[in-house]
Amino acid sequence: MQRLTLYHKVCSNMEEKEIIINGHEAVDLGLSVKWATCNIGATKPEECGDYFAWGETSPKNVYTEETYLYYDAANNRKLIDIGTEISGTEYDAARKQWGDDWRMPAEEELYELLRDCLWQWFTINGVNGYKVIGPNGNSYFLPAAGTSDPEYPEYNECGYYWTGSFSDEDCHWDALCLKFNDDEFGHYSTYSHPYEGLTIRPVTDKSN
């Protein structure tokens, strides 16, 4: 994986209010979108939930190039083109699992979360992760859910969260995700192979 950028910023405080959309709780962090308080497939903030390959809308048992729905083995191992921004489309797992009001975060929404929020390494019921505090003082918890890779699960050590954005520049052919841990790098944007199983924290429009 390739590390890109690290951001930090101090934020303020205000009372949080419960927001329920299609049966799922959202929190207004004072950003351009509201964020879900749980991962897809989770019922509590500290639960990992389900893992998804990028552009696939259902979890599965094995995550490899060969099992990836958009892997084109007959065409020099290239990927079937589903676009470079799938947030809100038919390839969006958040929209498929939670309904049209929810979607995967786009690139600019991830950068906003990194740039404008205070990130504090935190533990809930034995699960490590980050408490993310927005500019308005509201917060949510992102568990270190690791990946679906049985050899390097990294559960309780690292978190990997998909966005809906993809890069095909310079033969990169990888999708943008958030990665975090508690070491010197903290939290940053990076790219991951689209066939890997990562978690998703959905967003919803501010108007919802």
Where are these regions (language model features)?
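Short, Lys/Arg-enriched N-terminal segments with co-localized hydrophobic residues
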Residues: 1-13
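Conserved positions within compact, well-structured domain cores
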Residues: 11-208
